[in-house]
Amino acid sequence: MKAPLSWLRDHVAIPADTTVDQLKDVFVRAGIEVEAVQEGAEVTGPVVVGKVLYRNPEEQKNGKTINWCVVDVGSHNPEEAPKDIPEGMHGRGIICGAHNFDVGDHVVVALPGAVLPGDFAISSRKTYGHVSDGMICSQVELGLPDDGTDGIIVLGDDAP
């Protein structure tokens, strides 16, 4: 059974300074076998919560449909709105291949300068005819365990 540390903390009082090795020792002393400990992958740089303001599915020549999105990332929005986003919207233009989200959803966004597991550096780049200024992330892209959800992380409406 895999049990994320965050889940354990939701159900058991674990002091904040407890290391994974100390926790493993507690389990073993209690007679609970620990086969392996999987450390999370490191993510560096700006990763923030954004709100999807606009989502336009665009079919490509290769048959793939991508989403041209505008995502409000608060204080991380560019000072000037990109030229190819709808008038009156202020946020970052981002290309996303996932389809499990919609306008109004809160999502996890890696901004240019972030480095995701596998040394995947996020930068502004032109792709599919737009400048994508970040990446809307899935659990796997952030190095989190795959929970079987196909697509990006959609947070609750109360996400900060």
Regions found by a protein language model. Give the residues of each.
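Phosphate-backbone binding interfaces of nucleic-acid-interacting proteins
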Residues: 1-160
